[in-house]
């Protein structure tokens, strides 16, 4: 008899989150999968065509049965709308999950990005049906929240901390992306080491392709191209690139271009900061693109850029874009504390700088820009080699399945 897994995740296809491919991978491994997710509206708070409060509430995606709960859209990406979005999905999904009580699953799997409260409906089903719950911790709370919303009130901070830890403790098993995050989860939950696994993120196989676009290559042929691809929010701290560009301008280096592919709550702020600093000639904002187009921009790049806001606990995680970048086979420029930079150093796949250190980033850009092309190509080859050895889809999927169903 086939094993059955219920996945709880606020975000799912058609939003660009890796859980969609993980669910597909489970099906490929002869597992029946149901998903309880929200209404697609990330990152700009706008529903794609064909979706609504009562439209497409049940779908099929690559053999995965998808069920959608209500949530308040994050339209406008104001602090209030994000807060309402964060609390509305777990609220509505906790009622929606009751309709699943007549179904039998071997495991519940929560893919926890922000907010941590999306774990709650998974806890509800797990406890009522006595089915083990495994949560993949992609965003550590409350630390990730503080990188997005500036919460200074001590009472609120303590409340968020206690409720976040409560959710982690109620899971039967946890998955961390890195050894450092593993240690932190063991410490805050009191769980045994056997109940907390370290499994890195993988990226979809299409990231491993080199796809040339003649039009883009012609457009940027006279530039050293640094590509940032992904969400643009306070947690990413993309503005560090603006400060580095100002140093490049003062140094008289004019043929470097930051190509920003993506959208998010901070995009307008970053564009305004670029204008304020007078470095518009160093930036092109291309907006959001289909995730399957990312190999085009990775192939275009001379270097791929991965920043993260300064935070001791954010440094415990490896951003998903770092994994995707390494598969792309290009040198990676990080501006990250902790694990995200450590993996690049270990793989000899690029140059690293501390979070928020625009001077160090500027120096690394100049170093990479000035080095022979063969040395950059060697870094890119190292990145792709490390990807196939440690982050391949087949290996990570099997590790996930074994741990969840054990």
Regions found by a protein language model. Give the residues of each.
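Conserved donor-binding/catalytic core segment of Leloir-type glycosyltransferases
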Residues: 219-236, 241-246, 259
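Membrane-proximal helix-turn-helix segments that form the acceptor-binding/catalytic region
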Residues: 124-128, 155-174
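A short, well-ordered alpha-helix in the C-terminal region of glycosyltransferases
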Residues: 126, 360, 367, 374-389
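Nucleotide-activated donor-binding/catalytic signature segment of Leloir-type glycosyltransferases, i.e.
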Residues: 261, 268-295
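Nucleotide-sugar-dependent
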Residues: 236, 286, 290-297, 304-326, ...
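N-terminal subdomain of nucleotide-sugar transferases
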Residues: 1-60
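Carbohydrate-associated surface elements
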Residues: 39, 180, 199-202
């Amino acid at each position: 008899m086939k094993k059955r897994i219920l996945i709880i995740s606020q975000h799912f296809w058609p939003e660009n989150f890796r859980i969609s491919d993980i669910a597909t991978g489970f099906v490929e491994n002869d597992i029946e999968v149901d998903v309880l997710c929200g209404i697609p509206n990330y990152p700009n708070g706008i529903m794609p065509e064909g979706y609504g409060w009562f439209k497409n509430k049940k779908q099929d995606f690559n053999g995965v049965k998808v069920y959608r709960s209500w949530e308040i859209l994050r339209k406008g990406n104001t602090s209030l709308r994000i807060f309402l979005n964060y609390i509305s999905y777990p609220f509505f999904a906790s009622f929606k999950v009751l309709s699943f009580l007549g179904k039998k699953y071997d495991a519940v799997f929560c893919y926890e990005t922000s907010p941590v409260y999306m774990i709650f409906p998974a806890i509800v089903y797990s406890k009522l049906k006595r089915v083990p719950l495994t949560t993949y911790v992609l965003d550590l709370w409350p630390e990730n929240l503080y990188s997005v919303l500036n919460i200074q009130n001590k009472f609120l901070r303590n409340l968020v901390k206690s409720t976040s830890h409560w959710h982690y403790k109620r899971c039967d098993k946890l998955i961390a992306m890195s050894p450092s995050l593993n240690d932190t989860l063991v410490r805050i939950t009191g769980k045994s080491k056997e109940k907390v696994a370290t499994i890195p993120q993988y990226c979809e196989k299409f990231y491993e392709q080199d796809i040339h676009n003649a039009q883009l290559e012609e457009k940027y042929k006279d530039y050293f191209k640094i590509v940032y691809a992904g969400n643009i929010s306070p947690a990413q701290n993309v503005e560090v690139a603006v400060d580095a560009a100002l140093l490049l301008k003062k140094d008289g280096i004019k043929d470097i271009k930051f190509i920003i592919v993506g959208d998010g709550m901070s995009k307008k702020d970053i564009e305004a900061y670029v204008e304020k600093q007078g470095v518009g000639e160093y930036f092109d904002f291309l907006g959001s693109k289909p995730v399957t187009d990312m190999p085009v921009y990775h192939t275009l790049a001379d270097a791929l850029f991965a920043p993260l806001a300064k935070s001791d606990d954010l440094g415990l995680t490896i951003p998903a874009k770092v994994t995707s970048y390494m598969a792309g086979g290009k040198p990676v420029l990080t501006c990250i504390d902790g694990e995200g930079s450590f993996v690049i150093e270990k793989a000899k796949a690029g140059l690293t700088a501390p979070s928020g250190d625009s001077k160090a980033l500027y120096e690394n850009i100049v170093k990479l820009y000035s080095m022979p092309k063969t040395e950059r190509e060697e870094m890119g080859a190292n990145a792709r080699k490390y990807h196939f050895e440690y982050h391949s889809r087949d290996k990570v999927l099997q590790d996930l399945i074994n741990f969840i169903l054990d």
